[in-house]
Amino acid sequence: MKKISGNKLLVKALREEGVDTMFGYPGACTIDLSDELYKQDYTKVILPRQEIALVHEADAYARSTGKVGVCLVTSGPGATNLVTGLATANYDSVPLVCFTGQVARHLIGNDAFQEVDIVGITRSITKYGVTVRNREDLGRILKEAFYIARTGRPGPVLIDLPKDVMAELGSA
């Protein structure tokens, strides 16, 4: 069986979820994922001027299309720039799936450069937030994220993606 990276698996999952448009801003922890998104031709990635705008653009996209808004930012300040937009989406019941880059697993909790506990910071303004700890869990977490964002009272979901998890190879 052919093995693919977590980055390729996420791109595949976006297509399976019917995500034809997303909003993304690349950075050190998400550059490989951004490269995978660039290589494919199904999901259009809109690059805003900065992260604060992109979560609001994803929110507006969700409100105007009835689809789940999707966005991608890097770690640290990229992730914290989502907070106001996530709060808005939460209070207005707008379905979003937001991906944040994160430092490698062995650096989490060690005050690494641009490491921030974004799941903890956004706990009260998201329906669900998780840091992906194992490559094997990625597919399940992605399916759950879209399901949770759109069911019941819609709202934002945050998936934190450690760089090493996304680089790992595994089954498709």
Where are these regions (language model features)?
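N-terminal alpha/beta PP-like core and its mobile active-site loop of ThDP/TPP-dependent enzymes
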Residues: 1-172
